[in-house]
Design a protein with these regions (language model features):
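Metal-dependent phosphoester/phosphodiester hydrolase catalytic core
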Residues: 1-265
Length: 265
């Protein structure tokens, strides 16, 4: 944990991050390398210590509800009426069941019938969504929700958990669901109609410091954007006048490389 603590401290000292803190409200949740080990999950022995470091780095108040439970999942809502937005930060690390290695070169891990999010986080999420009245709902988690054909970490490694997430969205008719993911060192936008006239987007952006520039192609039946391998970040803008979202993937110079417009449901 000493190395991780030092990296958090270094990040806080970077002029660009200081400028970001001065000009924006920062919300965050971890992925594996913030958590402590590559592809790590619930069996990681230092997860409680790592959680404290994360919350200290994010300046999460001591009286925040997330401080009272295991894991790092959080929720925030903004605005009201027809202009309400909710953000759900999902923890895909703290409770994740361990993978079983797969001998196939096409899939690194065997499919797992585990919960991925853990029982408590699932209960929290369903309770949150049962009273949700937001017009836009953003869900963020480290691993990709939709892309299923690549060999790395993804929700598709946990098919029952993925189905459960889709079922909860449709059960409560959650409006304009958009999932935000990273992890892959690439950027892409995926889209899936999970039932008739009900869809979800998965916006993947990663990363600002490392990217998989040598990757030429990768199967993803749900991809609706180019496969982008340069350093990148994502941006979402909301136009309430025409009830439309604009999602962009930008390169390290801030130049848009892909734009997707999404009608607010």
């Amino acid at each position: 944990m000493k190395d991780l603590s030092e990296k958090y401290a270094l990040q806080k000292q970077l002029p660009a991050y200081i400028k970001l803190e001065e000009n924006a409200t920062i919300f965050g949740v971890w992925d594996d390398h913030d958590f402590g080990e590559n592809d790590a999950g619930g069996s990681f022995s230092k997860k409680k210590e790592s959680r404290k470091l994360l919350f200290d780095f994010l300046d999460i108040p001591k009286n925040h509800p997330a401080q009272e439970r295991e894991g790092a999942y959080q929720s925030y809502c903004f605005g009201g009426g027809t202009q309400k937005v909710c953000l759900y930060l999902l923890d895909v690390r703290y409770f994740k069941e361990d993978y079983e290695k797969n001998s196939s070169p096409n899939q690194r891990y065997k499919k797992n019938n585990g919960l991925l999010l853990g029982a408590d986080q699932w209960s929290w999420l369903e309770k949150e969504l049962s009273t949700n009245d937001a017009t836009i709902n953003l869900f963020a988690g480290g691993i990709q929700l939709l892309s299923a054909e690549h060999p790395y970490e993804k929700w598709a490694n946990f098919p029952l958990a993925q189905k459960r997430f889709f079922d909860i969205l449709t059960k409560y008719s959650i409006q304009t669901p958009i999932y935000l993911s990273g992890d892959r060192h690439i950027a892409e936008v995926s889209y899936q109609e999970i039932k008739s006239n009900y869809w979800i987007y998965d916006i993947t952006s990663s990363g600002l410091t490392h990217s998989y520039e040598s990757l030429e192609d990768e199967p993803n039946q749900y991809r609706i954007s180019p496969l982008l391998t340069m350093l990148n970040f994502g941006k979402i803008e909301i136009n309430w006048e025409i009830f439309e979202l604009q999602v962009q993937i930008l390169d390290a110079d801030g130049i848009p490389q892909f734009t997707q417009k999404i009608s607010i449901q």
